[in-house]
């Protein structure tokens, strides 16, 4: 009998110990008035009433912008929603009236997905919702709605963590073995510590603009199955990804790295390492690589070694492209080579190009006739030329701008000054001239030239035929390359009457471009012309 009573007592205590505490809608359990109001609306219960176990367990998902959060500043009480699987927060004081900056989710053991983003702008006008940037007003620094602290430790079911716009000083993700995606971005380089356990399921890791200046190491071996990695805009000085044999995409641009080890990343398909200090880049062993971007790698000592199967190369601001043999890459379909200081481009070495960007090189003539697959909408070939100008003997005020020998003047479709004022008043024509050795050279002749600090200003442009035709409005149209020309005087040994600079004449223009020898009433542009071909303009009001 005594043993039976003891058994019943133990059973009673066990039942009592496992019973859930009563949860009430009040300031004790939900101290934030905004969150408490949401609880009342969600369960359709007034303040001061009790929540049943079934009601608490029914909360599987909270999405702040769908749930009409209002004036919510903390989520104390969220731990009572033990079946919560998804929490998505959007901090915006002015749009959704939410400003949660400190968060403890360590008791929500069923949580699978946590996402947080913040917007440090508010939209005072309805037009803002339609993308009107003028109506987006920046919030002052103390009001930035960035996440400052979050506890996600020991959440065995957690699979996705996305945190954008934060000033976290640390992030502890230990005890989260089922992580698949972690994106902690736009942290204003605030994080000094980030901790992981072995994450065998982690496939995507994005730590863009995350770490402070003292953080320079990450143990990549903890995530051996990682496929997609982004560590852009941090302060890493060296990166060794030899343990990431399953990596498929890597972006590490604008770090301070001088070397990059990806030799074991045989599955790598996409690499972005632009804006780094690397001196060499060897991708010859990465046979799966199809896209690479090493733009603005200004310390490269040689053109990178790339696999034969590469399809896309982006190398803006890399003059070493001029030394590369693009015929080594027969599968190349996209080339982005703007600002590479190229003077020529041999399209016959990459006949399969579909997209081509050669903007703002120094190419004076271009033949694209062999690029039969080129998409005109993905083709950008505007150039800027800096030519030397020499005085033409016995021609007062005329300057010769010699063009590179590859220019065929018959291929120049059109040319003109870029300013109406110059167009009305100055001479410009193209001609071949013969030097003292009997050699013909292409050139432009002008009687206008900027002087002094303005010598690099654009004077005129010309359009050059590229021998590539495409269909437009049912007709075959030739693609033209626009070249913008600046010129600077170079010594020629020629001494003529123009050596003494005197005023040749003065003309006036009104706002409509009308010319007169005397000023118009009101606003004028006064242009003084000199005998050496230069001019000076100023605004006057009569």
Task: Please name every model-derived segment.
Residues 74-80, 104-107, 151-154, 172-175, ...:
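C-terminal per-repeat helix/turn "cap" of leucine-rich repeat
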Residues 510-532:
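Short, surface-exposed loop/turn motifs with a glycine/proline- and acidic-biased composition
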Residues 2, 12, 16-93, 104-113, ...:
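N-terminal capping/linker segments that flank leucine-rich repeat
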Residues 78, 210, 296-297, 434, ...:
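Hydrophobic alpha-helical segments, especially N-terminal targeting/anchoring helices
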